[in-house]
From Swiss-Prot:
One of its GO terms (biological process) is regulation of DNA-templated transcription. InterPro entries: Integrase-like_N, TACO1_YebC-like_2nd/3rd_dom, TACO1_YebC_N, Transcrip_reg_TACO1-like, Transcrip_reg_TACO1-like_dom3, YebC-like. GO terms for cellular component: cytosol. GO terms for molecular function: DNA binding. Gene3D superfamilies: 1.10.10.200, 3.30.70.980. It is found in: Cytoplasm. Belongs to the TACO1 family. Pfam families: TACO1_YebC_N (PF20772), Transcrip_reg (PF01709). PANTHER family: TRANSCRIPTIONAL REGULATORY PROTEIN YEBC-RELATED, TRANSLATIONAL ACTIVATOR OF CYTOCHROME C OXIDASE 1. This is Probable transcriptional regulatory protein C8J_1116. It comes from Campylobacter jejuni subsp. jejuni serotype O:6 (strain 81116 / NCTC 11828). Its main location: cytoplasm.
Length: 235
């Protein structure tokens, strides 16, 4: 997803009252990370990042602790990562990442959202060559020397570093997530959000009218309780 479009979406979402949906999604991400890699954040970089993302979104500590506790409970839900690919209006490409304890419900909901909003679900694997899987870290702006920071992080797997008026974005290959996460923490950078994202290899520009049509689908997807992230090839 193009950076300009990301910022447009972020500013739009900031105006919406999404906390009632956001906190459960953040809790689910924490629970899955803890279940997959252990409940000790010091030994689990994905859990550390999930916790940092939750804190950056003002999620209460009690909620965070409860999500970690649920992961180690005997009766914890079997939450699965589910991935869907599709097309939106005007041919925009869409990848949807979900976390769900009921895949049957999730696939029915996702297919319905696509079909009712001018899109269609594609066979998984159809868009694999159109996107690159990257470890992406969204951080508070850095006041120091960016060139020096870039050099310091290259050995940890840094591929791209970009700072704008709102934030610093650091990315690398998805396999470097843990190493990059540790290097960023060692530098004392303030994390806002981190995770594995799908970045379009060839972003496409759309008109404002077309974007308005496409966003109807994206909004509905993001509102679904099982949807964790939505990626597009929009520039």
């Amino acid at each position: 997803m193009g950076r300009a479009f990301e910022y447009r979406r972020a500013s739009k979402e900031a105006r919406w009252d999404k906390m009632s949906k956001l906190f459960p999604k953040l809790a689910k991400a924490i629970q899955v990370a803890a279940k997959e890699g252990g409940t000790d954040p010091d030994m689990n970089p994905k859990l550390r990042s999930a916790i940092a993302t939750a804190k950056a979104n003002n999620m209460p500590k009690d909620n965070i602790d409860a999500a970690i506790k649920r992961a180690s409970g005997k009766d914890s839900a079997d939450i699965k990562n589910i991935h869907y690919e599709g097309k939106a209006a005007h041919g925009a490409l869409v990848i949807v990442e979900c976390m769900s304890d009921n895949p049957t419900r999730t696939v029915a909901n996702v297919k319905a959202i696509f079909s009712k909003n001018g899109g269609e679900v594609l066979q998984n694997g159809s868009l694999g060559f159109m996107f690159a899987r990257k470890a992406v870290f969204h951080l508070e702006k850095f006041a120091g020397d960016l060139e020096e920071l870039e050099l310091d992080l290259i050995d940890a797997g840094l591929e791209e570093l970009e700072q704008n008026e709102e934030e610093l974005v650091i990315s690398g290959d998805y396999t470097a997530f843990g190493e990059l996460s540790s290097a960023i923490e060692a530098k004392g950078l303030v994390l806002k959000k981190a995770g594995l994202e799908y970045i379009p290899n060839n972003p496409v520009s759309f008109s404002e009218e077309q974007l308005s049509d496409i966003e109807k689908l994206l909004d509905k997807l993001e509102d679904d309780d099982d949807v964790q992230a939505v990626y597009t090839n929009i520039d």
